Amino acid sequence: AQRDKQYDQYYDRHIRDQRSKDFYNSPEWAAARLMVLIRDKYLCQVCLREKRITHTMTVHHIIPIREAWERRLDLDNMEATCPACHNAERRRG
């Protein structure tokens, strides 16, 4: 059990981080990100739910890719968010 925990920690720090870095530099991510921004009209969806209009270029994974790698390109798992809302969402989960 201790070895599994150590491996999980190593994996999270080294392998998963690099995989995430590679993903966020991929053409697949660039295409998905653009589709989300167009779909959401470059408006922060969190702000819109609170009746505010904020333009943005940031896309947020609702379920983080570290928890659901298989949903990394699922447009239903992404929304445009302003940097402030994106940072708040990341702190929450």
Give the positions of each predicted feature.
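Short linker/helix segments within small regulatory modules
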Residues: 63-78
